[in-house]
Amino acid sequence: MQDTLSSPILAGQTAVVTGGASGIGKSIVQRFLEAGANCLAADLNEEALAALKEEFAAYGDKLDIARVDVSDRDAVEGMVDRAVDMYGQMDIIVNNAGIMDNLLPIAEMDDDVWERLMKVNLNSVMYGTRKAVRYFLDRGEGGVIINTASLSGLCAGRGGCAYTASKFAVVGLTKNVAFMYADTGIRCNAICPGNTQTNIGVGMRQPSERGMAKATTGYAGATRSGTPEEISAAALFLASDQAGFINGETLTIDGGWSAY
């Protein structure tokens, strides 16, 4: 049986990954490169992008980097155009970029937090997915969309109000797209990581006491934190032809936390 984690199962394909300079996104970029794909890593952090390019210099032009504000529709659409111009095609898009909300319950949340979370966590996914679907339809060969949702897109008590709402919406968007375009060869799935060792929580300098207490119920001692490599392994599988009949799925990767 072919080893999906070390063989070039994406050879000849091109992938775009947002939030691709760190954490889960960086690990997905590495997995895809190792699997033979060309990859455009998009991120807001220019220093992290430069470090990524240097770290993976052995891949040469197979890795392209682009500073992209995913809350900007034109920037997201331009990102896809750049990948197509660079490599002649795009076969896979991973809408991975996201931010958190300090676990704020609704009574502690202001409008700015809500609007920022929706722009980055939801609008960006819609922009990337819509652009990809239009491109795939024009090309007529199908394609793969992977959206990073979260355990908070399935379990309402694992995050703040805005974060949870944004991730539930990502799950709904994913399933709708999968069903609407299933007859075109387009597959759209979501990965739903639980607690993972990444830098997404760096911005949570003052998490809500109520939110933290509620969100971590049942977690202490239940399971360890996941690693970006464990999440990216699932993304690679979903991107490959071995997942050819998997569409509209939400793949939970949480070590059993959601079983509580």
Predicted region positions:
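Short C-terminal tail/terminal secondary-structure segment
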Residues: 2-7, 100-103, 155, 236, ...
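Substrate-binding pocket helix/loop in short-chain dehydrogenase/reductase
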Residues: 104-106, 110-115, 216
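Active-site helix of classical SDR
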Residues: 129, 166, 174
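C-terminal helical subdomain
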Residues: 190, 209-246, 253-255
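Residue(s) in the substrate-gating loop at a strand-loop-helix junction
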Residues: 150
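Short, small/polar-rich loop/turn modules that mediate ligand/substrate recognition or access, typified
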Residues: 182, 187, 246-248
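Canonical Rossmann dinucleotide-binding motif of NAD(H)/NADP(H)-dependent dehydrogenases/reductases
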Residues: 7-40
